[in-house]
C-alpha cells in the first residue's frame, strides 16, 4: 500500500494570463514517517508531438515528512515561450504534477490546459507569431487524470547502493521477442489506476 496519499489538489489563480505563475495547493497524507524527501515537480507539456518540448517548471523537495496530513502551495513560473513550438502555443495542452520517493515516481496528476486569446478579434484572426501577452491560460481543474504507480517504499541505502554497483549487460533480462522501448523504469509498475481526485 502507498505510504503517501494525495487527498486534494486545488488549482489557484485560474484562469489567468499565460505569463502568470502556476499555483497548486496540494494536500497529502503520510501513513507513517518518511525518512527521506518527497520530490514534487510541475511539468508543462509544450507539444503533444514530442517529449523534447516538455519543461520542468519547478522541482521541490519536501521532507523528511512525519506521519499525518500536510498541505503546501506549489508555485512555478510560466513556461519559457521560446521552447514552445509556435504551432502549439494556442489550444489545448497538459500540465503535470508528479511526486517521487527515492527516485521512484508514485503519482502523476495531469490537467488539460487551454491557452486562448481573450480578444474576439485575435480569436478570429490569430497572429502568425503567438502573442503570449494576449493569451489566457485556463486549467480544467474539475477533471484531473491521476495515475498511480507501485513503488518500493522500503528500499534501504544498502540495497540502493548494491543496485547502483551492478553493471548488467544491455537487454540481458529481456526475452528475445522483446524489443527495447519506452517503458517506466524498473520498480515502477502501474496499477492501471486512473481516476479523478
Curated annotation (Swiss-Prot):
GO molecular function: histone binding
Protein location: Nucleus
Cited InterPro entries: ASF1-like (IPR006818), ASF1-like_sf (IPR036747)
Keywords recorded for this protein, A-Z: Chaperone, Chromatin regulator, Nucleus, Transcription, Transcription regulation
One GO cellular component, as annotated: nucleus
Main location: nucleus
GO BP field: DNA replication-dependent chromatin assembly
Source domain of life: Eukaryota
UniProt xrefs under PANTHER family: ANTI-SILENCING PROTEIN 1 (PTHR12040), HISTONE CHAPERONE ASF1B (PTHR12040:SF22)
Family to which this protein belongs: Belongs to the ASF1 family.
Complexes and interactors: Interacts with histone H3 and histone H4.
Role: Histone chaperone that facilitates histone deposition and histone exchange and removal during nucleosome assembly and disassembly.
Protein name: Histone chaperone asf1b-B
Source lineage: Eukaryota, Metazoa, Chordata, Craniata, Vertebrata
Gene for this chain: asf1bb
Amino acid at each position: 500500500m502507498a505510504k503517501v496519499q494525495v487527498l486534494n489538489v486545488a488549482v489557484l489563480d485560474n484562469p489567468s494570463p499565460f505569463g502568470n505563475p502556476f499555483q497548486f495547493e496540494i494536500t497529502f497524507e503520510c501513513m507513517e514517517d518518511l525518512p527521506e524527501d518527497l520530490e514534487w515537480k510541475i511539468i508543462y507539456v509544450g507539444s503533444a508531438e514530442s517529449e523534447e518540448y516538455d519543461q520542468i517548471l519547478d522541482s521541490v523537495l519536501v521532507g523528511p515528512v512525519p506521519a499525518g496530513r500536510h498541505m503546501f502551495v506549489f508555485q512555478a513560473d510560466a513556461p519559457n515561450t521560446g521552447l514552445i513550438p509556435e504551432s502549439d502555443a494556442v489550444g489545448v495542452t497538459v500540465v503535470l504534477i508528479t511526486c517521487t520517493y527515492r527516485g521512484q515516481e508514485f503519482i502523476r496528476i495531469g490537467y488539460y490546459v487551454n491557452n486562448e486569446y481573450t480578444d474576439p478579434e485575435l480569436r478570429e484572426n490569430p497572429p502568425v507569431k503567438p502573442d503570449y501577452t494576449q493569451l489566457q491560460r485556463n486549467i480544467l481543474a474539475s477533471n484531473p487524470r491521476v495515475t498511480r504507480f507501485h513503488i518500493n517504499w522500503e528500499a534501504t541505502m544498502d540495497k540502493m547502493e548494491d543496485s547502483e554497483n551492478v553493471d548488467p549487460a544491455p537487454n540481458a533480462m529481456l526475452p528475445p521477442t522483446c524489443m527495447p522501448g519506452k517503458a517506466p523504469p524498473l520498480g515502477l509498475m502501474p496499477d492501471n489506476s486512473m481516476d479523478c481526485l
